[in-house]
Each structure stands twice: as structure tokens, then as C-alpha cells.
Amino acid sequence: IWLTYELTGDKKWLPLAVKYTEALDSVKHLKWHHDVGFMIGCSYLNGYRMADKKEYKDVIIEAAKSLSTRFRPNAGVIQSWDADKGWQGTRGWKCPVIIDNMMNLELLFEATALSGDSTFYNIAVKHADTTMAHHFRPDNSCYHVVDYDPETGEVRKRQTAQGYADESSWARGQAWALYG
């Protein structure tokens, strides 16, 4: 809705954007998956940027803190999913990282700018560097999932969870990689 508001300039979208953004307030506390980054980024971050909603600043920073709890320093990545629950638990993963996670970096960079805390920046850069080193094939297509050993940083597996095959190029994932 925020992007529709931005593209059209039509103020009729503003109350809807605010309403649906503020319904996501509790998301700032999610620590069990990486989606908090783009859920808050696409809503609160856009509202902060487009409508000068200064009150969104604290939500953005809190969400970045929640996302940062998923950072695995020895592997240099933000873990996407918990590997011990649900369907993810059946894959044998230890520290799965999906290319979608690149969408979260904007939130971390903005949280650094808003808070002055370079921890968020450092996590974003380290995650991006590690992703560049291990998610991409020689033809520059990317894997959907790279599983790491969270203690050593060693790559355990390169797979897909939603694409056609482990070695296929997944269009949506390619877009997320470019965005990040």
C-alpha cells in the first residue's frame, strides 16, 4: 500500500497504509524467523520514509534488534529458519540461510542510521559478504538455501526449498539477491 501511495501520490492510500502498517506492531518482537526484516521494512520503514512517521523509528530499531538475534557470528550469517521445528526440522539443517534474507539488509542499514548503533551495519555487511561467497554459482545464479555449520561456518549443503531443483535458478530468489 505504501508503494501505491508513493507511485500515485493519491492521499486516499495513506490511511490504509497506516492502518495495515500499525497492525504489524507485534512483529517487531519476532525472533524465530528472518521474515521480521522485510515485514517491518516494507511497512514501517516505508511509512517512516514516505509519510515522515517519526513514531515508527522505535519499531524499526526494535525489529532490527530482534533480527540481529538470528545472527550467527561464527558462520557470518543471519539464520533464516529454526532448524529444529516444523518441515525445516526434517531437512537435517543446522543453520539454513535462504537468499530471501538479503531483503533484510535494508532494515539493518536503516536501523544503524536511526540509532547510531553500528552493530546492525556490521551484521548486514558480514551477512552480505558471506552470501556473496557461498550462495552464488559461477554463472551468477544463486542457491535458495545454503546450510552452514553455525560453529565453524563450513557450508554443509546447497539446496532449494521452494525452487524446481537444487541446481536450478529460481527467479524470485534472483530478485531478492539483486535487491540485497
Identify the function of each model-found stretch.
Residues I1-G180:
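Glycan-recognition and catalytic cores of secretory/periplasmic carbohydrate-active enzymes
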